[in-house]
């Protein structure tokens, strides 16, 4: 008999935790057959070798897509996601976002929701690297944007920074193209607009534009049985929460009706899973397919963002597609 550990099984509906006792050695590397192994993806290393060099789709599902992207200077046109919500999570550099709701600026660790139907464009500052999450279903705030519990600032440095050179976009008063995008891209449209007439033009209604400091809502250390992970955004099929676990998680978790997509923001992580041990460093991603037991061993300063989806999601890019291997330091 091996070391006895606890495992908790969860469903999104009903919201329940079922605790069981198992042998630890039966929960690490014991998958013998299956079609959804867990990759370790250096998502920003994909950009240099990806066509166009600015965006790489990393995860693709029926109701959720996640891409890694670099914004080099001012985007040449506007974008309006017609029938899906956008969430931007800033990893390095900064994003100055102009939209029909007004303007905000994202720094490392900040996240913002662009509601469906709202035109926007970004000016990237420094090495502007971020995640773009696309949710087919409507998403709402899970925390109060005006009431973070702490005020944390981050400095992110890259071992081999990507080139940030880009030709300037259209003049502020000039005309440019607005790309109206749809979940099914065969419906996409390009319409000529005057940018100055769109920025801040919404007078009332809708969900607005607010940024969150993603890692400033912790009430304690997550994963130890006390403080719960703050839920930043939530919808019927999708949610985002964050974790700050240092040390070993209280028990193994087995989510039975959701896939989990992990983004490691800071610190090293050793993840014990039935697929084996998966390690992650800052700027890397993996996922846990539904039904797989897993346990986090978080290193010093561990911070992670997790995207949950009730529909299947699949990796669309792998390290074999990356032209080089780089690393990040987050302080």
Q: Regions from the language model: what does each represent?
A:
Residues 1-68, 75-78, 150-241, 331:
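A short, N-terminal "cap"/entry segment at the start of jelly-roll beta-barrel domains
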Residues 116-147, 290-316:
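Ligand-binding loop in jelly-roll beta-barrel domains
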Residues 62, 98-102, 125, 272-276, ...:
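Short strand-coil-strand connectors
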Residues 129-173, 318-330:
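A hydrophobic/aromatic-rich effector-binding and dimerization subdomain
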Residues 100-117, 274-292:
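Short acidic-glycine-tyrosine-enriched beta hairpin
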Residues 225-252, 256-263:
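Acidic/His-leaning functional-site neighborhoods
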Residues 80-97, 133, 244-246, 254-271, ...:
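Short, conserved beta-strand element in jelly-roll/cupin
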